[in-house]
Amino acid sequence: MSKRRIAPLTFLRRLLLRILAALAVFWGGGIALFSVVPVPFSAVMAERQISAWLGGEFGYVAHSDWVSMADISPWMGLAVIAAEDQKFPEHWGFDVPAIEKALAHNERNESRIRGASTLSQQTAKNLFLWDGRSWLRKGLEAGLTLGIETVWSKKRILTVYLNIAEFGDGIFGVEAAAQRYFHKPASRLNMSEAALLAAVLPNPLRYKANAPSGYVRSRQAWIMRQMRQLGGESFMTRNQLN
């Protein structure tokens, strides 16, 4: 009886270890491959695509029009750094002081959860993982973040982030966003347009770049002030990000 009980547990343990090993190889290979190859698809795109199919939207196609950093306005890179992660050039994937502040805030305000994810963490999550707040997902995100910070340059992380970020329902990547909202390529985005796109990133399915609310407009103005305080376009050059 005891052996019969132990055998299934041993099998499940071995199965779990094999699955984790396979995922590690898959993700490790992905990190190595995407350090030089354009990213054709992300986990978020896959999630949106499956949801569309399940909802009967068979004409929906989630994709991103990849562009290199040379074809992205420096204002756009600066805007997302100003909005999401001002210590991006300095840290190794995690902003510890920001995490501590977020934890303290969330303890006091359980109904209004604040995140502290860096651009590196967001890139790891959007590229490889499902959405959610489980400890398992956060643990995997941390490992993947360390992986891309080790293998990729900061410029590469920012390039991938801008190409897979969601800027609206079914609008993935800065090139698609620039074409949809401003009818121009990403290389021609100005400071105001870049700040507006960055302003919707916390929740691109709720906040609209083509119909910005008062909150989005105020956030856009705040981002522009932060961009100036960081030093404008010279910030990108100083940190070898363009």
From Swiss-Prot:
Transmembrane segments: 19-39
GO biological process, one term: peptidoglycan biosynthetic process
Subcellular localization, as worded in the UniProt entry: Cell inner membrane
Enzyme Commission number, as recorded: 2.4.99.28
Biological function: Peptidoglycan polymerase that catalyzes glycan chain elongation from lipid-linked precursors.
Reaction(s) catalysed (UniProt annotation): [GlcNAc-(1->4)-Mur2Ac(oyl-L-Ala-gamma-D-Glu-L-Lys-D-Ala-D-Ala)](n)-di-trans,octa-cis-undecaprenyl diphosphate + beta-D-GlcNAc-(1->4)-Mur2Ac(oyl-L-Ala-gamma-D-Glu-L-Lys-D-Ala-D-Ala)-di-trans,octa-cis-undecaprenyl diphosphate = [GlcNAc-(1->4)-Mur2Ac(oyl-L-Ala-gamma-D-Glu-L-Lys-D-Ala-D-Ala)](n+1)-di-trans,octa-cis-undecaprenyl diphosphate + di-trans,octa-cis-undecaprenyl diphosphate + H(+)
GO cellular component, one term: peptidoglycan-based cell wall
Protein name (record): Biosynthetic peptidoglycan transglycosylase
Pfam family for this entry, one: Transgly
Pathway terms, separated by semicolons: Cell wall biogenesis; peptidoglycan biosynthesis
Principal place of residence: membrane
Single GO MF descriptor: pentosyltransferase activity
InterPro entries linked: Glyco_trans_51, Lysozyme-like_dom_sf, PBP_transglycosylase, Pep_trsgly
UniProt keywords, alphabetically: Cell inner membrane, Cell membrane, Cell shape, Cell wall biogenesis/degradation, Glycosyltransferase, Membrane, Peptidoglycan synthesis, Transferase, Transmembrane, Transmembrane helix
Family recorded in the similarity comment: Belongs to the glycosyltransferase 51 family.
Recorded name of the encoding gene: mtgA
Organism, as annotated: Salmonella agona (strain SL483)
Gene3D superfamilies: Biosynthetic peptidoglycan transglycosylase-like
Membrane topology: Single-pass membrane protein
